[in-house]
Amino acid sequence: MKFALATLACATSAAAFQPTTFLRAPVANVAADSSSALSMRYKVAVVGGGPSGACAAEIFAQEKNIDTVMFERKMDNAKPCGGAIPLCMVGEFDIPESTVDRKVRQMNLISPTGVEVSIGSTLKPDEYIGMCRREILDKYLRDRAIEYGAEAVNGLVTSIDIPQNHKTSDARYTLNYLEYSEGSNAGKPSTMEVDLVVGADGANSRVAKCMDAGQYNFAIAFQERIKISEEKMAFYEEMAEMYVGDDVSPDFYGWVFPKYDHVGVGTGTVVNRPAIKQYQKAIRERAGDKIAGGKIIKVEAHPIPEHYRPRRVQGRIALVGDAAGYVTKCSGEGIYFAAKSGRMAAEAIVKLMKNGTHLPTQAEIESTYIKDYDGLYGPTYLVLDVLQKVFYSNNGAREAFVELCNSKYVQQVTFDSYLYKKVQGNNPLDDLKLLGETIGCLVKGYAVAKPDQEFSNPVESQKRI
């Protein structure tokens, strides 16, 4: 569910896509003998094997002075996710086309009153939005990290013993985890000492809790994978759909995204999480005959962070991906930012380690990884936050949003912003014209829209994770 309302952010977004260095030299597996600077050998634990963890582990594994251990409880896990990835990720992270189920070149936006706008006419023939199944993409990234030398542990990290003086170079972290053998549901309690930890274990991050990273507000994303007939699947060959309206979500959107041989149908909300199944029923009804008669083959639900964690580095523990809160508002995009943050964190830490002669401090990690990431993408998160508040707040604004997407200028900068994580060719005159169109569309939208249904859940809305 990753690219929906990047639309108007394009005119003001300041984030630019700047590929980071990606080491490719193969490394030999050398047994760890000490974590001292004299032996130039350290152990890094990457907790989580999704895109953020796998991309971090891949960088660490290519360093001869680092032993890399990657923990993942469910190696075949299919995380609830729309599965959209931008074109720049395919190239930057060397994603093979075999992991891309569908190449979406057209997006239908459907307003609360049923007005449809198709976007995608500005795309070049070789441009597309990739649709992936997370179980396929994640496995590919994990396997690549393992090929470079990362040790994969099928285990669940339950807690971390953090020494009182953990900001000093001679202190080590003890990971307590359950290790699972193949075919067993019972985990064997185990421990491991490491010099540095990267928390890539998702929105419900145990690493974040152990390091007292603070809480954040969250959305619930709910998705059903529905197998439909080949005839109906043909409609979604290169097509995705986005539905807006308070019937499908009071603050987000509903989607129908094509997968390999089925569609993902889902929605999400922050402000009314208890009603998520009601909203899911509504998105199925609005999709109507296009998915009628389909068989639900999988039901998925998962929390999605709404903003950064208050603390993302503590001592030599750093958070990346969903654990850090790197999911954009409006679009709910997280895969690219997970992979990017994992890589950026690992590259910064590797550089700070100076060929195994130095363990980085909290201040050093914050002044490199955190500063660089926020400098690149902070403006994008801010703008999309504002846009979500403006265009997802009520049905009148949602009607205006869909109508605005008729603009070829909006479509052009939308796809430039999403596909390449940069804005190309913004024209001040066109931006000024867009402002006028926005005001006009809002006036018209409020005139035709039906009132939003009222709801109240003051206790649930205060919950944080």
PLM segments and residue spans:
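N-terminal chloroplast transit peptides
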Residues: 2-27
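Beta1/beta-strand and adjacent pyrophosphate-binding region of the FAD-binding site
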Residues: 41-52
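Predominantly flavin-linked oxidoreductase catalytic cores and closely associated redox partners
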Residues: 59-62, 144-293, 325-326
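Short beta-strand to alpha-helix junction loop
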Residues: 123-144, 270-278
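FAD/FMN-dependent oxidoreductases across multiple families
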Residues: 159, 271-349, 353-354
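C-terminal helical "tail/cap" subdomain of flavin- and related membrane-associated enzymes
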Residues: 350-465
